């Protein structure tokens, strides 16, 4: 078990973790509710996922600042289960997927994520950043255009929004722009200040002073549901195994890649140990088993929350616990001050984190990179936007596999270290 309680926990660390947990909880509110609705589940279950799983992943997980929650990558699997088997059936699929994740941990499959080249990880980070920014275009512009959410092509969805740019509302654009500008200024002049929170506070102040009215978070008169009731039958095992395995695989890759992105974003060049990746899957497997008992969807790594927490000063496991505590308070107590935050302000926070993820240093080095590294970086970033994150990683890795096969066929002696280079990639 990782060291959870430390002899020294300074007030500065506590303040940073509180700020990081708060901004992560604010980001979780609209997206948790929306994703659960897309799955066909009661919206509150999207928040229950974070409340139920965060304490377990904070205690057992190896990445102290990795924050999980309801993820878009799990939507197709759970939505299909809800449609065919109901909420109880979806709970069975999630619980079976949790068992698969624990099996992956026991088989030590998580450590193989270290074989993904660093250029693929940076391309994944860049693609996720662009996706985070583009996904907020409609909210930041105040455009209420119909967008085909069934398509994974984020570029196509963005084009649908921009084709209705004439309907843009200046108030929404100003609120989101103030968040982004204030966050960047705060990060530049006051590096230790929680930049996303500064941006939200600035946007709320501007909205009140100038009377900029936009849709707000609103009150959350929601109740925590009881444990899900369902019965297992022998035939159910064969019905849930295919979907559960797919859900477990997608969630596992998401968690491990997100963990590497977060470590890279923190500026830590020393990778986590190989065993840490296995333990991370075990921690999320145990946590998701408990979430499944509540009929809540699976928890996976969320880059937006994790990186927003880091940007706000979160450095320890307590930021994850505070994130869950704030969500529980919002749901159970209905914090009135949170209800008045404009939705475009939260969209601005997500867009700000997305801009930070765009790997500007890698873009500057791109002309000097090896051809295979440049192709892997660009293809991964683009594939995240037009296909999905999991296939994007496969596309990026395929260039190194092709290079290894070519070297093995053309020069068998020189190919001895080919696979080693695949695991390192470009620095």
Protein language model regions, located:
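Generic signature of intrinsically disordered, low-complexity, basic-rich segments
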Residues: 32, 68, 419-422
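Short, non-helical or kinked segments that cap or interrupt transmembrane helices
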Residues: 39-48, 62-74, 113-121, 192-198, ...
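Membrane-embedded helical hairpins/re-entrant loop segments and their flanking transmembrane helices
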Residues: 6-23, 27-64, 234-318
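Hydrophobic alpha-helical segments within and immediately flanking transmembrane helices
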Residues: 31, 48-57, 71-83, 323-327
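Core transmembrane helix bundle of multi-pass membrane transport proteins
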Residues: 1-21, 78-79, 83-272, 325, ...
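Short phosphate-engaging motifs
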Residues: 74, 289, 401
């Amino acid at each position: 078990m990782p060291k959870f309680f430390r002899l020294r926990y300074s007030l500065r660390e506590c303040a940073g973790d509180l700020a990081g947990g708060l901004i992560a909880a604010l980001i979780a509110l609209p997206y948790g509710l929306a994703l659960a609705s897309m799955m066909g589940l009661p919206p509150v279950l999207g928040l229950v996922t974070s409340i139920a799983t965060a304490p377990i992943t904070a205690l057992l997980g190896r990445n102290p600042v990795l924050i999980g929650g309801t993820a878009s990558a799990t939507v197709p699997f759970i939505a299909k289960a809800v449609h065919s088997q109901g909420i109880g059936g979806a709970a069975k699929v999630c619980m079976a997927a949790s068992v698969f994740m624990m099996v992956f941990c026991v088989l030590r499959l998580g450590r193989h994520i270290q074989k993904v080249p660093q250029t693929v990880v940076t391309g994944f980070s860049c693609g996720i950043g662009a996706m985070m920014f583009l996904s907020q275009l409609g909210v930041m512009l105040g455009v209420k255009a119909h967008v085909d959410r069934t398509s994974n092509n984020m570029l196509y969805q963005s084009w649908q929004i921009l084709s209705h740019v004439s309907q843009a509302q200046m108030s929404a654009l100003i609120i989101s722009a103030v968040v982004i500008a204030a966050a960047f200024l705060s990060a530049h002049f006051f590096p230790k200040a929680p930049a996303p929170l500064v941006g939200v506070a600035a946007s709320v102040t501007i909205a009140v002073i100038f009377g900029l009215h936009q849709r707000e978070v609103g009150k959350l008169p929601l109740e925590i549901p009881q444990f899900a009731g369902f019965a297992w039958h022998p035939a159910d095992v064969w019905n849930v195994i295919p979907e559960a395995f797919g859900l477990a695989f997608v969630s596992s890759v998401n968690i491990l890649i997100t963990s590497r992105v977060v470590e890279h974003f923190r500026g830590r060049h020393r990778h986590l140990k190989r065993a840490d990746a296995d333990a991370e899957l075990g921690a999320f497997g145990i946590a998701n088993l408990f979430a499944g008992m509540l009929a809540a969807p699976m928890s996976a790594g969320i880059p937006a929350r994790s990186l927003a927490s880091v940007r706000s000063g979160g450095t320890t496991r307590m930021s994850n616990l505070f994130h869950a505590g704030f969500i529980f308070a919002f749901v159970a107590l209905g914090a009135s001050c949170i209800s008045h935050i404009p939705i475009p302000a939260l969209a601005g926070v997500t867009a700000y984190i997305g801009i930070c993820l765009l790997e500007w240093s890698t873009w500057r080095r791109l002309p000097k990179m090896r051809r295979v590294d440049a192709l892997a970086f660009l293809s991964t970033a683009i594939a995240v936007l037009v296909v999905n994150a999991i296939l994007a990683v496969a596309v990026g890795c395929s260039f190194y596999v092709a290079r290894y096969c070519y070297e093995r066929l053309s020069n068998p002696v020189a190919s001895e270290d080919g696979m080693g280079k695949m695991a390192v990639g470009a620095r």
